[in-house]
């Protein structure tokens, strides 16, 4: 071997190592018996490329349609698409350690401290307790004037562009309305996007930050995250820090205010007085991180739901039925409030079916099987395996839902669940808000905002889809949240 140079020996060694890993992953790995596409079982490279392309949700859905409800999507990761997996992975089981979120997928914030999104069991409970009141029924009642204010302002702004004969790009308007609302609820002041008729730049930063996080994750998993400043596209550089800078600026202004503001921070600030010496509040760093999380979770998810509802109602000819329910329930617009819209069963069914076909958070970070391993869907899974449930994989599976590719709000009505063809639907597989102690804390707020805003729009306007300009709205990429394409709707003022 003396005639071989060191570079050649190094290259040969690398080839042998890669081949060994491929063979091991396919034939000797503890997960070798799980089905899945060959290249994905052999190497994590296809998974990483798919993550970077933003097509993970569609690829997982396709793999589940091919291989069934349990698919090996990386050498050390399994994706599920059934109701049992939600319970086995996410539900609290006495005496069993929690399946924590993958720390590689969700690293700590730039300041190195935790948030409600990335925290251990004890600290997550503390964060959730502090924010719990703001998302309770009592908290929602206190927040109703704020939610209604921005729904009404959206109606006012849309009157300016209605009846023109031209379709309106609604993603922008929904983003402005919900971002303003979540600004008021999060920091006690709006971002004034609707009043200025201009989307706040933080929204663009959020999307670019999440895309940069995906790139950083791939580099981190390869042990070369230090190359991120050199490999990150220019438009994404610094977006993570910029995202936190916005949160810092808004939080500082909020903390300068005295007395209750009727927002998410009232209880947190009281509990965190005197530098959080008692330990049951939050440190300043934790406040910053949670502020950034709340803005993303509270704005993008709700605006996505509104976009999905209006698109699917128009696309599948369900708009007339939804309009009839809303207009039949109210003699005047001022009768529309959070309590009254919660009594509209078809409107709620529309939201539920939208979240099945277009879940607000389509890509969730996997959980890590705790020490000692665990039983998932009747099979033992070794410790340190990554496991998760694919929303779209479960929701579009014909073995879970009849006519899974059709928008049928009726399937969510109480009586329909007992009748054909829906009585065999597996509703346990449908968990858009997740389950367990880490389910979405903002679920009630999201329902309230979507119900109220959608009801007001359907009461005031006749809405139809500009299919030629919109195309297939559901054909979108994701980087944690949807990279929404444009949604063009024709808006006409209702005739009385």
Curated annotation (Swiss-Prot):
The gene is stcL. Heme binds at residue 440. Its EC number is 1.14.19.n5. Gene3D superfamilies: Cytochrome P450 (1.10.630.10). Cytochrome P450 monooxygenase; part of the gene cluster that mediates the biosynthesis of sterigmatocystin (ST), a polyketide-derived furanocoumarin which is part of the most toxic and carcinogenic compounds among the known mycotoxins. The first step in the biosynthesis of sterigmatocystin is the production of hexanoate by the fatty acid synthase (FAS) units stcJ and stcK. The polyketide backbone is assembled by the non-reducing polyketide synthase stcA by condensation of the starter hexanoyl-CoA and 7 malonyl-CoA extender units followed by cyclization and release of norsolorinic acid. Its cofactor is heme. It comes from Emericella nidulans (strain FGSC A4 / ATCC 38163 / CBS 112.46 / NRRL 194 / M139) (Aspergillus nidulans). The chain crosses the membrane at residues 3-23. This is Versicolorin B desaturase stcL. The lineage of its organism: Eukaryota, Fungi, Dikarya, Ascomycota, Pezizomycotina.
């Amino acid at each position: 071997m003396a005639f071989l140079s060191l570079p050649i020996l190094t290259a040969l060694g690398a080839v042998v190592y890669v081949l060994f890993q491929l063979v091991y992953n396919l034939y000797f790995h503890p997960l070798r018996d799980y089905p899945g596409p060959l290249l994905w079982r052999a190497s994590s490279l296809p998974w990483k490329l798919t993550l970077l392309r933003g097509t993970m949700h569609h690829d997982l859905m396709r793999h589940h349609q091919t291989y069934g409800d349990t698919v090996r999507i990386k050498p050390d990761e399994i994706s599920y698409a059934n109701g049992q997996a939600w319970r086995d992975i996410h539900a609290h089981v006495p005496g069993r350690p929690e399946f924590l979120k993958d720390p590689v997928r969700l690293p700590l914030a730039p300041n190195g401290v935790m948030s409600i999104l990335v925290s251990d069991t004890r600290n997550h409970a503390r964060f959730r307790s502090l924010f719990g009141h703001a998302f309770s029924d009592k908290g929602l009642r206190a927040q109703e004037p704020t939610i209604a204010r921005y729904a009404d302002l959206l109606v006012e702004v849309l009157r300016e562009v209605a009846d023109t004969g031209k379709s309106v790009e609604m993603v922008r308007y929904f983003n402005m309305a919900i971002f303003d609302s979540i600004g008021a609820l999060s920091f006690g002041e709006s971002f004034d996007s609707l009043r200025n008729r201009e989307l706040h730049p933080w929204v663009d930063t959020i999307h670019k930050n999440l895309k940069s996080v995906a790139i950083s994750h791939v580099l981190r998993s390869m042990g070369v995250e230090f190359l991120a400043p050199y490999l990150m596209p220019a438009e994404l550089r610094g977006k993570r820090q910029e995202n936190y800078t916005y949160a810092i600026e808004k939080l500082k202004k909020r903390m300068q205010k005295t007395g209750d503001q009727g927002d998410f921070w009232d209880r947190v600030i009281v509990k965190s007085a005197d530098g959080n010496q008692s330990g049951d509040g939050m440190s300043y760093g934790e406040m910053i991180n949670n502020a950034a999380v709340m803005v993303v979770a509270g704005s993008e998810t709700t605006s996505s739901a509104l976009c999905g509802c209006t698109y699917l109602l128009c696309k599948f000819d369900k708009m007339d039925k939804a309009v009839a329910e809303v207009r039949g329930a109210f003699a005047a617009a001022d009768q529309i409030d959070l309590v009254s819209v919660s009594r509209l069963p078809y409107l709620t069914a529309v939201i539920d079916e939208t979240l099945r076909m277009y879940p607000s958070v389509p890509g969730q970070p996997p959980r890590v099987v705790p020490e000692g391993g665990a039983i998932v869907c009747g099979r033992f899974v070794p410790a340190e395996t990554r496991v998760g449930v694919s929303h779209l994989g479960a929701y579009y599976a014909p073995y879970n839902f009849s006519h899974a590719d059709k928008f049928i709000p009726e399937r969510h009505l109480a009586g329909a669940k007992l009748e054909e063809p829906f009585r065999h639907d597996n509703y346990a597989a449908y968990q858009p808000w997740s389950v367990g102690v880490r389910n979405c804390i903002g679920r009630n707020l999201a329902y309230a905002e979507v119900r109220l805003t959608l009801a007001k729009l359907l009461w005031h306007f006749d809405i139809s889809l500009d299919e030629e300009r919109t195309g297939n709205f559901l054909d979108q990429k994701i980087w944690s949240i949807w990279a929404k394409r444009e949604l063009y709707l024709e808006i006409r003022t209702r005739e009385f």
